[in-house]
């Protein structure tokens, strides 16, 4: 699954949807952490209550101190981590869009954050302030493939989302399309 999905392409408007936390890996970890946390919590409670709360095991025979309390502690931590994953999926943290509009000569970058006053992060730049587009390609154990917008006085602003790096051809094509649309140079390829 790509980090950037083209949504609108026209002569005057280019818009990409950026996938935030709603990636398959986050769904996997949300399910795994919730299930594991619930299992450990029930095992710890079973040892405390001396009553089997798990149908596939007999944790009631565990001694509460130290085994049961450790299971309960790790179960609560796992459940809280699972809850965080589910909330990040619900809130779609990091999701948003990149919009390039020739009519207004504006670039709008929108990302979703945590609930509150500043839930939506919105950055706007003029076409005239864009110096170039930079592509970062790093292979190896922790690969990185990202597109950055180089803006005067602002440095490099990432346009790609987090997660699994998109295929090399896809990142090159997207960077070339954006650079042509903005009429700026492309660095790093």
Swiss-Prot record:
Keyword Transmembrane carried by entry: yes
Cell compartment(s), UniProt: Cellular thylakoid membrane
CC per GO annotation: photosystem I; plasma membrane-derived thylakoid membrane
Keyword Coiled coil: no
Parts of the chain that traverse the membrane: 25-45, 62-82
Membrane topology: Multi-pass membrane protein
One of the protein's GO biological processes: photosynthesis
Keywords per UniProt: Membrane, Photosynthesis, Thylakoid, Transmembrane, Transmembrane helix
InterPro entries: PSI_Ycf4_assembly (IPR003359)
Family of the protein in this entry: Belongs to the Ycf4 family.
Function: Seems to be required for the assembly of the photosystem I complex.
Protein name (database record): Photosystem I assembly protein Ycf4
Gene: ycf4
């Amino acid at each position: 699954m790509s980090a950037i999905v083209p949504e609108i392409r026209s002569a005057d408007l280019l818009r990409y949807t950026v996938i935030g936390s709603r990636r398959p890996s986050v769904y996997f970890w949300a399910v795994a952490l919730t299930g594991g946390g619930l299992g450990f919590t029930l095992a710890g409670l079973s040892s405390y209550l001396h009553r089997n709360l798990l149908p596939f095991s007999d944790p009631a025979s565990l001694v509460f101190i130290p085994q049961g309390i450790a299971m309960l502690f790790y179960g609560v931590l796992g459940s809280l981590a699972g809850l965080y994953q589910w909330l990040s999926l619900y809130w779609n943290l990091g999701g948003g869009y990149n919009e390039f509009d020739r009519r207004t000569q504006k670039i709008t970058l929108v990302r979703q954050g945590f609930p509150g006053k500043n839930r939506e992060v919105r950055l706007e730049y003029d076409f005239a302030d864009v110096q170039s587009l930079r592509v970062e390609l790093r292979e190896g154990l922790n690969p990185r493939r990202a597109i950055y917008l180089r803006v005067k006085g602002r440095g490099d602003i990432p346009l790609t989302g987090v997660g699994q790096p998109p295929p090399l051809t896809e990142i090159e094509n997207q960077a070339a399309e954006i650079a042509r649309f903005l009429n700026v140079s492309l660095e790093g390829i």
